[in-house]
């Protein structure tokens, strides 16, 4: 990506093609990773009806986690290709070619963010199922995540959201960030045993980085709703430029 960024300084079109290849590879890795995790968590030689179950998926490698590679690939491809006019959904493919999408890039980002939040809560739900939801704290990310998924998806469907819609969305994303940071603290506390720090517990017990994915989704959601038009000041006059 650093090389592509340097190339973009002189040839944006060539850099875009390069990063597209990289992000397609990321999507491929994500899909393959999810497949291998599912296979690792099943019993292919077991009798029919017992080869896959919820219990197997709970204790299997995280089946949803690799899909984040695929979502990052989609985000990257969407970001790499410029929108001819902000919020028009018309991508500039170079050479005078354009691709008209059914949604603007901003709305497409919101749809992808809602899918990413859904993947996050599914992964968290499977992880927390290992403790049978006995701790009331583990219910918080589930409820907040479900609400955030609905709010983000709903905002993506609105062509002209109101101020109230935006306020609810921003508040929800802020809640996601708080939940992520709080979850990371609770996971670290769970991994610390007594007065000693055992590295193995950080590897085998509560994953202290996993809750930060909630915070990442919250930050991403806030970035998505920023004004897609960049404005620079030239002799005191604001000039709109394509994002």
What is the role of each PLM region?
Residues 1, 58-62, 105-106, 127-147, ...:
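Transmembrane alpha-helix entry/boundary detector in multi-pass membrane proteins
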Residues 1-4, 62-83, 143-154, 208-227:
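Hydrophobic cores of alpha-helical transmembrane segments in multi-pass inner/ER membrane proteins
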Residues 10-18, 97-103, 158-166:
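Membrane-interface helix-boundary motifs at transmembrane edges
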Residues 28-44, 79, 124, 175-191:
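C-terminal TM-helix exit segments that contain a strictly Trp-centered aromatic cap at the helix terminus
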Residues 36-59, 186-208:
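Interfacial non-cytosolic loop connecting adjacent transmembrane helices
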């Amino acid at each position: 990506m650093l090389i592509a960024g340097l190339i973009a300084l002189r040839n944006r079109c060539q850099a875009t093609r390069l990063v597209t290849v990289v992000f397609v590879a990321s999507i491929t890795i994500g899909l393959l990773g999810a497949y291998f995790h599912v296979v690792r968590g099943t019993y292919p030689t077991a009798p029919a009806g017992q080869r896959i179950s919820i219990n197997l998926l709970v204790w299997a490698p995280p089946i949803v986690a690799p899909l984040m590679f695929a979502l990052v690939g989609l985000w990257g491809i969407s970001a790499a290709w410029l929108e001819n006019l902000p919020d028009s959904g018309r991508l500039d493919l170079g050479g005078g070619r354009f691709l008209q999408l059914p949604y603007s890039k901003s709305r497409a980002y919101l749809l992808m963010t809602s899918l990413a939040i859904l993947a996050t809560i599914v992964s968290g739900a499977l992880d927390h199922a290992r403790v049978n939801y006995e701790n009331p704290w583990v219910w918080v990310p589930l409820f907040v995540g479900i609400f955030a998924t609905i709010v983000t998806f709903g905002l993506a469907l609105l062509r002209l959201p109101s101020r109230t819609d935006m306020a609810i969305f921003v508040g929800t994303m802020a809640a996601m960030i708080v939940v992520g940071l709080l979850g990371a603290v609770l996971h670290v506390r769970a991994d610390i045993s007594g007065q000693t720090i055992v590295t193995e517990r950080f590897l085998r017990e509560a994953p202290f980085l996993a809750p930060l994915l909630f915070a990442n989704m919250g930050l991403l959601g806030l970035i998505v709703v920023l004004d897609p038009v960049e404005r620079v000041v030239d002799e005191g006059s604001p000039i709109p430029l394509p994002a």
